[in-house]
Amino acid sequence: MPTIQQLIRKPRQPKIKRSKSQHMEGCPQKRGVCTRVYTTTPKKPNSAMRKVAKVRLTNGYEVISYIPGESHNLQEHSVVLIRGGRVKDLPGVRYHILRGVLDTQGVKDRRQRRSKYGAKRPK
């Protein structure tokens, strides 16, 4: 426990809150170009082939982002828009690709939560 004199000399420093998506630089979304599109397996209790892409952002950073929804049309050099939000069972994946924006197509035959997957309203 510091004395009052010590606190006068050197006051307490507030804790610095670090962003969980630092490469976004405070932006809600960022544009980037896919450098590699591949599948990877999740952590221990889960089992799947999760679709991810390595994306080079406009600010120069290279991040791994998750491709949500069933099937996608992404390949190398596709221009995508990413948002923050990690995938809990994929280490190092801290971003999501937005579907239905730029080169990414929306999910076909999606009926519920369509706005999350860039799907148009079914007729």
Swiss-Prot record:
Report the record's Gene Ontology biological process terms. translation
User: What start and end residues bound the annotated signal peptide?
Assistant: none
Where is the PTM 3-methylthioaspartic acid found along the chain?
D89
Entry superkingdom: Bacteria
The UniProt GO MF terms for this protein read:
rRNA binding; structural constituent of ribosome; tRNA binding
Record field: compositional bias (Basic residues):
9-21, 110-123
The entry's cellular-component GO terms read: small ribosomal subunit
Region entry Disordered, spans: 1-30, 104-123
Subunit architecture = Part of the 30S ribosomal subunit. Contacts proteins S8 and S17. May interact with IF1 in the 30S initiation complex.
Record HAMAP family: Ribosomal_uS12_B
Q: What does this protein do?
A: With S4 and S5 plays an important role in translational accuracy.
Family label? Belongs to the universal ribosomal protein uS12 family.
Descriptive protein name: Small ribosomal subunit protein uS12
Q: Which organism is it from?
A: Jannaschia sp. (strain CCS1)
